[in-house]
Amino acid sequence: MTSAPTKGAAYLVLGMHRSGTSALTKALSSLGTDLPAHVMPGDEHNEAGYYESWPIAVLNDQWLRACGSAWDDPFAYPLNTLAPAQEAEWTTKAAELFDEEFGDSRRPLLKDPRVSLLAPAWFDILEAKGFEVRCVISSRGPAAVAKSLERRNGFSLQRGVLIWASYMLAAERYSRGRTRVFVAYEALLEDWRREAGRVCRTFGDPEPEATGEEAVDRSLRHHAGAE
């Protein structure tokens, strides 16, 4: 049983790896939401940065392995069910780590594609803390995502598409019936302010003010012709 929302709103960015979740999170972070304390740095695959909690990503990886799965499992959805005692152990670890990463934030912004697969547990954790859960789902075509995974991880295109399907099925199914909005990667690159405004209207938040600052770098798009 979850608590009635009293603490604020928690924003969860869901979706597949290489589908624009980092760019979307950067845009949302300009709207008064709070990033975690220990943000994963950028690298040669994502120079602008990942905008996600490094410790939470590590925990989610371990959690998936405990379920007999992994972030790159083409058949991760639906996850194997853990015994109640095991599930409670992982939930407690995640809840404590969330507090370490976000402190007293009333508008935490949690992004890790793995959360898409673990969403039911994360929803329960956040609602137990008194947050209203708001889902923002990043979408990008499977061919483009598979091409990006082929380049970064050496996966076959077929495997990349299957992983994409697993994540997107999980993100859609688990967020169904909740307050959510889908943001297409192409639309975000074309006009991030327009998409940010649409997110704000969905959640009843103030729309972003017009500034000269660009939250999304269009030049970071990869494999543009694959979609």
Identify the meaning behind each predicted range.
Residues 86-123:
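Glycine-rich phosphate-binding loop used to anchor ATP phosphates in small-molecule kinases
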Residues 21, 116-120, 192:
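Short, well-ordered alpha-helical microsegments
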Residues 9-13, 103-112, 133-135, 180-181:
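Generic beta-sheet signal
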Residues 111-115, 129-149, 164:
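Conserved phosphate-donor/acceptor-positioning beta-strand/loop module used by diverse small-molecule
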Residues 97-106, 170-181:
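A structural motif corresponding to the C-terminal end of an alpha-helix
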Residues 1-91, 222:
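PAPS-dependent sulfotransferase catalytic core
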Residues 150-158:
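Short glycine/proline- and charge-enriched loop/turn segments
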Residues 40-47, 137-147, 176-227:
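The conserved 3'-phosphoadenosine-5'-phosphosulfate
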